[in-house]
Structures are given as structure tokens and as C-alpha cells.
Amino acid sequence: MPLYSQIRQSEDAFSEPTYAATNELINDNENACPHCRQERSESWFLKGGRSIVYVSLTFFVVSIGLNFILAILLYSKFHASSFQTEWSAAVADTDCVRRLVAYTPALDSIEYFATNLRDAYRSNDQYLGPPTKEREQMWQDLWLHEAIMVETWAMPLLNRINLDPYEKVEGELGDGYNALLQVHHQLGCLDILRQYTWLLSGKYTTDGIPVPIFLQKPPEENRRHVDQCIEELRMGLMCHGDMTPLLITKKRDGASGFKADMNTHYMCRNFTKLQEWTMSHGVEHWELGDGRGPHEHGRR
């Protein structure tokens, strides 16, 4: 068939061809030239294929970029000190403490340091042994301090809305309520347990070291007080749940069958700094046995 199947002879020979006529002409041309249809099909495929390739490459590059950013964010989260100066890392530690502890006015005094436990707190047995005047005083120096103040605005941070049961700070020292730090209460409880064991052993006498003020009660009341201290220490230990590994040595102990390395590596709080803060922020001195001291359990 000829390339053009007909030559217009009518008066509209030079008028614009209709869509049908144009389509017929294209079909006639492709019928006359079969490879034209194939070229048109291949051209469309190549153009469409390039688009798919471009989209795939773009998606791949974006995915790699997002994964890279995510990796940096995760690394910076778990290795923050790698991206911080020493000063900014210290600030981050303070922020961490604020998130992990209940409110305390002594927050800014909390400072951590890495140490082996016994290397930092070994006392050369100064706190051990039967009661002496010096030993009793050393124990009291650990825990018997003035009350500190929790300001009124901060009481809801301790989940306390009804403030009627709590003792207000007297005078012009501030608008707040008397409190003591839990560590001092726990050390006081430990001291009472120590004293109770020596009391049962007959080591406190009227002509030597007198019976501690908190244990000058009938035996059943003393026992009840000691039980309360045991319960306080149990709850405190369970609440804080120290998960520091206690390594087992190759040595064997006759009683338990194993011997642990008690000089455990710890992140400890600077106890000296806590003591200094407490002594500099005292608002009321409690005399032993005045009915309001740190170990009058259940009294307000």
C-alpha cells in the first residue's frame, strides 16, 4: 500500500484534517512500516523505565540518609559524652539526676564519683565493736543533724497536697516545712540496730556507757522500734534496687560455699558534700528524746 493511500481531490483538500483522518493516516503509515510501531513502543518503555530508575535511586538515597541520621541520633543518645565537652557532660548528668530522683532541696549537692566501695568508705573498724563514747559520737555524727526545709511551693512535688499534718518551719527562716534527708534516717536506723545488739549483750550499763535514748523503753517497745527500722531499711533497699555486680572470687567460704569481692566498683554519691549541704541548710535543731527527733516513728 502506498505511503499516502489517497490524495485529496475535493475542494477541502487544503483544509485541516480531522482527528479520525489523522488517526487513519497514522495507522496506514504503521501498517506500511511495521517497525515504526515497535520503535514507538520501545521509546515509551525506555522513557518509563528511566522514570522508575530515577524514583528507585531517589528512594534509595533518601533511605540511606535517614538511616545515617537515625544512627547518629541513637549513638548520641547512648554516648552523649562523645559529643559534649566535659562541662556540658556534667550538666547532662545533673539533668539526669533531676529526672531520676524525687524532688529534694538538696538536689544541687548531689555529686557522683567512681570508686571501689571499701577504698572510699573503709573506716578501719572505727564504727565496729562494743560501744565507747567515741564510737557512739562517730555514729551520731553520721546521721543526727538539724532539720532542713522543704518550701511550701515544693510540697506537691512530693505528692503532698494536704499540708495540715506537717510541721511548719518556725520563725522567719522561710515559708516551708521541717524535713530530714532519708539517708540520715536510714543511717539512724542502722545505728539503732547496732545499739540494740549491744544492749542485748549487756554492753550498755548505767555506770559506763548509758543505754541509748531511743532504747530506754520497755522491751516490747524497743523491739517494735527495731522492727520498724528493719522494715524501713528493707523498703529502702528494695526501692533503690542496687544492680551493681558483686563478683565471686575463686576463694571459698566455709559458711556459704563462695566468697565475694566486697570491694565492689561503684558510682557513689559524695557523702561529705551531702553532709556539708545539710549542716549549712539546717532550720531547727532536734534534741534527742524531745519527741520530734528523726527516730520518733509515726509521730508528727
Curated annotation (Swiss-Prot):
Pathway(s) of this molecule: Mycotoxin biosynthesis
Annotated compartments: Membrane
Disruption phenotype: Leads to the accumulation of isocyclochlorotine.
Intervals of motif HXXHC 2: 225-229
GO biological process: mycotoxin biosynthetic process
Pfam families in the cross-refs: UstYa
GO molecular function terms noted in the UniProt entry: transferase activity
EC number: 2.3.1.-
Membrane topology: Single-pass membrane protein
Keywords of this entry: Glycoprotein, Membrane, Transferase, Transmembrane, Transmembrane helix
Enzyme class per UniProt: transferase
Glycosylation sites: N270
Residue ranges annotated as motif HXXHC 1: 185-189
Cysteine-cysteine disulfides: none
Stretches that traverse the bilayer: 52-72
One GO cellular component, as annotated: membrane
Top-rank lineage group of the source organism: Eukaryota
Keyword NADP (UniProt): no
Described purpose of this protein according to its UniProt entry: Transacylase; part of the gene cluster that mediates the biosynthesis of the mycotoxin cyclochlorotine, a hepatotoxic and carcinogenic cyclic chlorinated pentapeptide. Within the pathway, cctO catalyzes the intramolecular O,N-transacylation from isocyclochlorotine to cyclochlorotine. The NRPS cctN initially catalyzes the condensation of L-serine (Ser), Pro, L-2-aminobutyrate (2Abu), Ser, and beta-Phe in this order to produce isocyclotine.
Entry's family note: Belongs to the ustYa family.
Domain notes: The 2 HXXHC motifs are conserved in ustYa family proteins and might form active sites. Within cctO however, the second His from the 2 motifs is not conserved.
The name this protein goes by in its record: Transacylase cctO
Lineage, broadest ranks: Eukaryota, Fungi, Dikarya, Ascomycota, Pezizomycotina
